């Protein structure tokens, strides 16, 4: 009996050694297996609180396809190490869901690790990424940039020993702040010296990529969260990467969006059969319940804004009086404090303005 027990334990050990891990973590990211040879990398925010987009990894017969390259090259390098911990196959394709830099600033890390990599985006998104290469350094170098100002405020609070509300920091908090300030300076230096890499392959509307027998479908939905939002779908596995068409971090990102066009896109997304869905930011989903909630939010905001426009109210009056707080309970898990600040800004200010412009035919 003792021999059988030891044999059983040895078998368990050998099995564990030969099976890929379902979750692998490093200091600021978690890579989770979501299908056979398919992984999602979910990142913590950078220390300047700018979010990294989620990254997808699809392993084919001979090569790997990666979806989005996050905000910082250093984080992308760490992602590459995570990928190399599960496969020795090279990354052949890097695909972008849209042009926003929190999804592609890290491209240089992939180009350096895999010099022959094919970098793919929708045609117009590629042009926007080229613009990133022109204005990015100017934006970051500006003395009043968000990155500079937030670091200056952090350093001032540290020097004063208390925050803007007068709360005095503990010794533990001071040590944590000192570490954060060092990290922030390193990140800022990284951004100041960022090399924006342009896509070297573009497509219009749709593109199918075969990784051996695995089919990967890219579809451009046009205007939604950005001018051109692309989803990546694995029909065999029913796995969808939504990009920022869907974000739960904790609420949708609505700046520079097109709500009138976004709504029908969400309705179409709901029709796609899924077992797993990786959002642009936020937790992994396993059905369309969150898609439905975002669609209901868009429908409600558009309906209420249009009603107020017909009543003759100005944009400022609409922003001051519209109320969609009934929609967030139990969905976005927002604290009462965040409800007064973040939710109010993202929804009442930004989304309402974009909806107002869309309805009036003024873009947005």
Language-model region placement:
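Active-site HxH/HxHxD metal-binding segment of metal-dependent hydrolases
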Residues: 85-199, 208, 303
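Active-site neighborhood of phospho(di)ester-bond hydrolases with catalytic His/Asp-centered motifs
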Residues: 67-69, 92-100, 120-123, 221, ...
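Conserved beta-strand hairpin/beta-sheet module of binuclear metal-dependent hydrolase folds
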Residues: 32-82, 230-242
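C-terminal regulatory/interaction regions
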Residues: 19, 310-364
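Divalent-metal (often Zn2+) His-rich catalytic cores of metallo-beta-lactamase-fold enzymes
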Residues: 239, 260-317
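Hydrophobic h-region of N-terminal signal peptides that target proteins for export
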Residues: 9-18
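Active-site-proximal loop/helix segments of hydrolase catalytic cores
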Residues: 215-272
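Core dinuclear metal-dependent hydrolase active-site scaffold
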Residues: 33, 177-180, 192-198, 202-234
């Amino acid at each position: 009996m003792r021999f059988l027990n030891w044999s059983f334990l040895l078998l368990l050990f050998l099995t564990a050694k030969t099976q890929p891990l379902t979750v692998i973590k490093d200091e600021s990211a978690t890579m989770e297996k979501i299908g056979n040879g398919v992984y999602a990398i979910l990142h913590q925010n950078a220390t300047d609180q700018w979010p990294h987009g989620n990254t997808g990894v699809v392993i084919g017969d001979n090569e790997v396809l990666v979806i989005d390259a996050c905000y910082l090259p250093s984080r992308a390098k760490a992602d590459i190490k995570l990928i190399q911990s599960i496969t020795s196959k090279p990354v052949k394709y890097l695909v972008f869901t849209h042009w926003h830099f929190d999804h592609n600033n890290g491209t240089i890390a992939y180009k350096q690790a895999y010099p022959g990599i094919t970098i793919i985006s929708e045609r117009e998104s590629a042009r926007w990424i080229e613009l990133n290469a022109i204005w990015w350094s100017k934006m970051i170098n500006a003395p009043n940039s968000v990155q500079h100002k937030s670091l200056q405020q952090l350093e001032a609070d540290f020097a004063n020993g208390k925050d803007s509300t007068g709360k005095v920091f503990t010794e533990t908090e001071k040590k944590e702040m000192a570490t954060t300030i060092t990290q922030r300076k390193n990140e800022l230096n990284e951004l100041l010296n960022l090399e924006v890499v342009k896509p070297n392959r573009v497509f219009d509307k749709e593109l199918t990529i075969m990784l051996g027998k695995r089919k990967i479908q890219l579809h451009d939905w046009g205007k939604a969260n950005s001018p051109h939002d692309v989803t990546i779908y694995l029909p065999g596995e029913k796995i969808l990467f939504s990009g920022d068409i869907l974000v739960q971090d904790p609420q949708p990102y609505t700046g520079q969006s097109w709500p009138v066009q976004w709504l029908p896109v969400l309705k179409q997304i709901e029709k796609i059969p899924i077992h797993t869905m990786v959002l642009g930011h936020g937790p992994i989903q396993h059905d369309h319940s969150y898609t439905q909630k975002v669609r209901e939010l868009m429908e409600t905001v558009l309906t209420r804004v249009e009603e107020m426009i017909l009543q003759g109210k100005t944009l400022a009056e609409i922003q001051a009086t519209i109320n969609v707080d009934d929609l967030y309970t139990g969905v976005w898990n927002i604290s009462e404090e965040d409800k007064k600040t973040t939710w109010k800004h993202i929804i009442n200010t930004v989304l309402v303005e974009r909806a107002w412009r869309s309805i009036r035919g003024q873009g947005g």
